[in-house]
Amino acid sequence: MNLPPLTPATLIRRYKRFLADCALASGEIITVHCPNSGSMRSCAEPGQPILISQSGNPKRKLPWTWELYWSGASWVCINTQHPNAVVAEAIAAGDIPALQNYAQLRREVPYGSHERVDVLLSSEGRPPCYVEVKSCTLLEEDGVIRFPDAVSSRALRHLGALTEVVRGGGRAVMLFLIGREDGRGFAPADAIDPAYGKALRRARTDGVEILAYRTRLSPDKISLSVAEPLLF
């Protein structure tokens, strides 16, 4: 997916989950919207370069949005609204072998108990395929990318909903999209959210398919890269 025009800045601090202060090249300090509810461990170090986009909506309280963070080795996707679009675009292009040959792709379709699946794939004569996408940015000291970066009851609930899809005769896929180019492999963050790690393993045993893919990032574009090994 193509990114909007981006402006360089330097991160000063991220606070109250959805706010960040940064300095523009001119020296002006502004507050930007941070579209990420996680802890953002390993991708919110003050003093690092970031890229921000400006909204054309005059009604927005904060016209700027934090899009990318420079880790020192890779750009990191901060905006959690992008992964779903990247995955949907890749599926439509046939770039994910496990999700090829479906006639219809729909996004944000209601299912389960008050849930909305990120992507629903369907074809006549085949069980529907429910795909949940999780954005992963946490890089641990061992070089492994992990999820979640904070305890997440919502992510846990999604695993339960996918398991129910399988029990009902459908196909369910949990796809972890790694929003950075450094690190290797994927595993659940057991030290941060042990309940999620246990639930992910249980869901896999119950028939939920687990995929992990890396992204290719630049100041202009985010696209699907290669599949990553599951290290659990």
From Swiss-Prot:
It comes from the Bacteria. One of its GO terms (molecular function) is DNA binding. It holds the Pfam family SfsA. Belongs to the SfsA family. This is Sugar fermentation stimulation protein homolog. The gene is sfsA.
